[in-house]
Amino acid sequence: MGNIKQGFIKRTARELFDRYPNEFTRDFEHNKKKVEELTNITSKTMRNRIAGYVTRLVRLKEEGKIL
């Protein structure tokens, strides 16, 4: 079983994904840079977790599992 992500990470990732749907791709490194540009988060760990969750959301959308 995997770990459950914190609410802050999920909420921030969803907000970014909803506001800027065309900015993100399935590439984690690209998403990491975009999260850094679009937010004021200074923690590298938080940035990476948010970028990872955004990458997951992009993949799920492409597979048609989320609207």
UniProtKB/Swiss-Prot annotation:
Coiled coil: none annotated. GO terms for cellular component: cytosol; ribonucleoprotein complex; ribosome. One of its GO terms (biological process) is translation. Keywords: Ribonucleoprotein, Ribosomal protein. The keyword Transmembrane does not apply. One of its GO terms (molecular function) is structural constituent of ribosome. Pfam families: Ribosomal_S17e (PF00833). Belongs to the eukaryotic ribosomal protein eS17 family. This is Small ribosomal subunit protein eS17. It comes from Thermococcus sibiricus (strain DSM 12597 / MM 739). The gene is rps17e.
